[in-house]
Amino acid sequence: ATKKFTIKILKHKKNLGLGRALKTGFEHCFSIGKNDDILISMDTDNSHTVNLSYQMAKKISSNKQDLVIASRYQLTSKTKGLNKLRKILSFGAAILYKIFFPIKNVKDYTSGFRAFRLEKIRNAWKLDKNFFSEKGFSASADILIKLYKVRHKIRFGEMPINLRYDLKKGDSKMKIFK
């Protein structure tokens, strides 16, 4: 049986940053979604492979996990086209996040390619109206940490990703130094 997925493109008139984009998208899904729906966030610059989203959703629909991250730090993960400085900074940030926020089964705190059980993230959002407070690239890690702190028995997991920065459309808007 073939399943159909509904995709709706939501746009801001000007770039408000990753955090605001996530807030707009998630809150739209909260308003129309059912508890057993699966919400997927991903970059649309060609660096993420959409086919992986089916495998991520399968882990959630099989009731094994509530949040699945496409992780750069799984054994079989590959990253192509990312400069060495960004690799070093990303890996360093991952270590720091793991030290200060030791989430079981999570190594990649900043990957934006994720699948969520809608019920779990909606419940966390209802408890904290500032759930989407970060505006920039730190929003991905912030959401993960807030879900960890809520402790609604969220089962975290990861899958390896083949991240293709060499296929990326446009320049990165991430500011390494503010």
Predicted feature locations:
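Short, high-confidence coil segments that cap the C-terminus of an alpha-helix
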Residues: 34-36, 64-66, 152-154
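Acidic donor-binding segment of Leloir-type glycosyltransferases
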Residues: 1-10
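Conserved residues at the C-terminal ends of beta-strands
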Residues: 42, 71, 162
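Short beta-strand-to-loop acidic/aromatic patch adjacent to the donor-nucleotide binding site
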Residues: 35-47
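Acceptor/aglycone-binding surface of glycosyltransferases and processive sugar-polymer synthases
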Residues: 12-31, 50-133, 166-174
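Hydrophobic helical membrane-anchoring modules
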Residues: 3-4, 55-58, 103, 127-178
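The start of beta-strands in P-loop NTPase/AAA+ ATPase cores
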Residues: 6-7, 38-40, 66
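Residue-level signature of catalytic and energy-coupling elements of molecular machines
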Residues: 25, 45, 117, 147, ...
